[in-house]
């Protein structure tokens, strides 16, 4: 779970990690004691000194040892207790990448301007890949070795988008499942400032301008194919009931791992 100054949210987030799962919190230069608090609550702490959401996420991915890894923000907006639901289709072999589709629990959880920006991003993603997704939320699950084979290069705000774009280019089976989205604890590190918003827009634009196959090992997955150069369709997983956002990583024995982060 990528973490930058989330001391206030970490105790609740880590207490919600499913039994038997191992949380990996990647500290990205916190000054509020987040790393110490994470360790006190049983997390394995990794330090990623180079600032950036993608840098923290990728450090967690490299530190993971489980076959299946899950990403989740650690700001309290997403509930790690729901990670088994998100990881389930991957563990069962029914999907290669599962994304948690955020369902706001209150108006304050997801303001209109943020929802509109997410909708526009989904439209641009469809134009680029053919995928029809409702959300590119931070809670997600995939197999570790498959993610490493995508050779993700973005180390800032474009990392989650690049993961989806390159997975689509490799013909992965991508599904969505609904997760509850609550107001975060503390200030957003990305959209909480104009500078952060600008960097996010810049990073994501660069990812969308990538050509298929740019800078990665081409590992295509068997499964859903493409129609007319675009994804034939993304499936909607329908059995989830809850979810949230934060920075960290956890593993269920040798079967699954979770990386959660909120910036």
Region spans (language model):
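Hydrophobic helical membrane-anchoring modules
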Residues: 130, 152-263
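Acceptor/aglycone-binding surface of glycosyltransferases and processive sugar-polymer synthases
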Residues: 49-51, 55-62, 80-157, 184-194, ...
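Acidic helix N-cap motif at the loop->helix transition within catalytic regions
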Residues: 8-12, 32-41
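Conserved donor nucleotide-binding strand/loop of the catalytic core
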Residues: 24, 35-63
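Short beta-strand/loop segment that forms part of the nucleotide-sugar
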Residues: 1, 13-14, 21-29, 46
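A conserved acidic beta->alpha catalytic loop
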Residues: 27-35, 76
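Donor nucleotide-sugar binding loop of glycosyltransferases
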Residues: 6-9, 30, 53, 79
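Short aromatic/hydrophobic "clamp" motif used to bind/position activated sugar donors
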Residues: 69
């Amino acid at each position: 779970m990528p973490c930058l100054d989330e001391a206030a949210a970490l105790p609740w987030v880590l207490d919600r990690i499913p039994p038997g799962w191992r949380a990996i919190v990647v500290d990205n230069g916190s000054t509020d004691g987040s790393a110490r608090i994470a360790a006190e609550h049983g997390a394995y702490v990794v330090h990623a000194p180079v600032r950036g959401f993608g840098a923290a996420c990728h450090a967690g991915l490299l530190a993971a040892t489980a076959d299946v890894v899950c990403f989740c923000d650690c700001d309290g907006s997403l509930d790690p207790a729901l990670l088994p639901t998100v990881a389930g289709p991957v563990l069962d072999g029914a999907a290669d990448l599962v994304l948690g589709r955020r369902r706001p629990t209150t108006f304050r959880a997801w303001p209109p301007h943020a929802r509109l920006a997410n909708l526009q991003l989904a439209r641009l993603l469809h134009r680029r890949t053919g995928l029809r997704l409702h959300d590119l939320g931070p809670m997600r699950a995939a197999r570790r070795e498959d993610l490493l084979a995508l050779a993700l290069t973005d180390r800032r705000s474009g990392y989650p988008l690049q993961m989806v774009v390159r997975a689509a280019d490799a013909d992965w089976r991508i599904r969505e499942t609904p997760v509850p989205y609550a107001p975060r604890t503390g200030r957003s590190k990305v959209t909480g400032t104009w500078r952060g918003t600008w960097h996010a827009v810049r990073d994501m634009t660069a990812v969308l301008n990538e050509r298929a196959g740019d800078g990665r090992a081409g590992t295509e997955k068997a499964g859903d194919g493409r129609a007319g150069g675009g994804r034939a369709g993304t499936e909607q997983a329908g059995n989830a009931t809850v979810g949230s956002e934060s920075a960290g990583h956890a593993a269920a024995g040798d079967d699954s791992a979770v990386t959660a982060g909120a910036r």
